[in-house]
Amino acid sequence: MKTTELEIDRDVVSAKEWEAARQQLLVKEKELTRARDALAAERRRMPWLAVEKEYKFEGPKGEASLLDLFDGRRQLILYRAFFEPGVVGWPEHACVGCSMVADQVAHPAHLNARDTTLVFASRAPQTEIERLKVRMGWQFISWYTITDGFDKDFGVDEWHGTNAFIRDGDRVFRTYFINNRGDEQMGTTWNYLDITALGRQEEWEQSPEGNPQTPPYEWWNWHDEYGNDEASAKVLEQVHRGRAAGGTT
């Protein structure tokens, strides 16, 4: 690939000067990290909105309720992706922005380990969704068809967005919602968990009393090893070594 010369004017400095400049920015980056942590803590104290209506979706196994989408877990994150008639590129492509979001989705095993399920929903029929998932390599994303007014009721009928829910038995509550540029941050396990009512569920978080919490890092595992005690022991050993060395992992 042929490249052209950069038409950018920047100072070229010594390694010592470069490191000094980086350290100045690092102070601001850490401030931003703490601010994000504080914002996530406020989200965890948001009031909840009870979902009173019954909503129906179509999935690979047939009809499903909103409660079914939790797949037995405590929390649900639902991203409204635009893949349906009227979208540019239909039926070969989903919305290009929604497709980029799908390309960056964290492996679901890590969210599942925090009692959280992530799903996508569109108005395309299941046959088209399954075809698209295979072609784009998105087989690990649970993707449902919206069949009623769910998208309008939850602010995602005309634009993409991400809703977070929690359930108490059979009762479902809406706990948070992001859209527009808010969706840009989505993709990592941590950012998904940060918009939920329970958060990352780690002891360092400022969370309401009663939120489940465990020591940080110790719940991590390889995505195909959750539930394997031997693998978990190896992770714990790595965490302890990191702490002994003064690190975080």
Regions found by a protein language model. Name each.
Residues 1-114, 134-135, 145-249:
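Non-globular targeting/processing and membrane-anchoring segments
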Residues 117-145:
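Conserved segment of the thioredoxin-like fold in thiol-based oxidoreductases
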